[in-house]
Amino acid sequence: MRYFPINLDLRGKPVVIVGGGAVAARKCLALLAAGARVTVIAPTLASPVNEVAENGVLIHLARKYSKGDLAGASLAFAATDNRTINRAVANEARLNGIPADIVDAPELGNFTSPAVISRGDLLITVSTGGESPALARKVRMELEKRYGPEYAVLIKILGKVREKLLTEKANSPYNKKILNQLVEQDLAELLKKSSVAEIDNLLRKLCGPGFSLAELGIGEKDKE
């Protein structure tokens, strides 16, 4: 295994993307969703990133990359169709100790971006180490079918239950038993069916009074 998997907290961190095509756009949107401060360097931007740039959510430098553009960056991405530019980005990143993902030549960078399935706080990633993005996409699509939008609500419910249990009864073996039992239940299927009464009954049966969806603060908006 060449790469070590890691989740980075990029909230408020400066990230530079060199390139404005479809690949760069996907990375840009994912980084913005993670709270990064994104600068994109490219003569033009693909949709929908061009609309995002017009709203001032990111910085767009409408030109080609120049040496020194990575100054102050926490991460860098090279996603152009010009290998010379991508290699120049890789060189600048390496000389300045900036982690870089070089899309067309992962061996020049020191990390790669996996295919991602995001269901709220449930994050599933698939990586082939840059060997086969096509296979990573295929596996991602299979996982997307297996883990639908209901899992975003499920993880929220589990988090609320855990928080309430820890607050009321501390981190006891009893709590761990309840949480383990809860994840073995078919809550995801009940969420797909919007079976609120059944979910409430199950939560109260396992966790006791005060653990209905409403009492946990899970409303209709969360279930959309």
Segments from the language model and where they lie:
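Hydrophobic, well-ordered beta-alpha structural blocks that scaffold small-molecule cofactor pockets
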Residues: 1-44, 49-53
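Residue-level detector of alpha-helix initiation sites
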Residues: 21-23, 84, 130
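Hydrophobic beta-strand scaffold residues
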Residues: 38, 60, 97-100
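Short loop/edge segments at beta-strand edges and connector loops
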Residues: 42, 60-64, 104
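Glycine-rich, highly charged phosphate/nucleotide-binding loops
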Residues: 53-71
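ADP-ribose/adenylate-binding Rossmann-like module
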Residues: 75-81, 86-112
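E1/E1-like adenylate-forming module used to activate ubiquitin-like modifiers
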Residues: 102-152
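An accessory alpha-helical subdomain
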Residues: 130-224
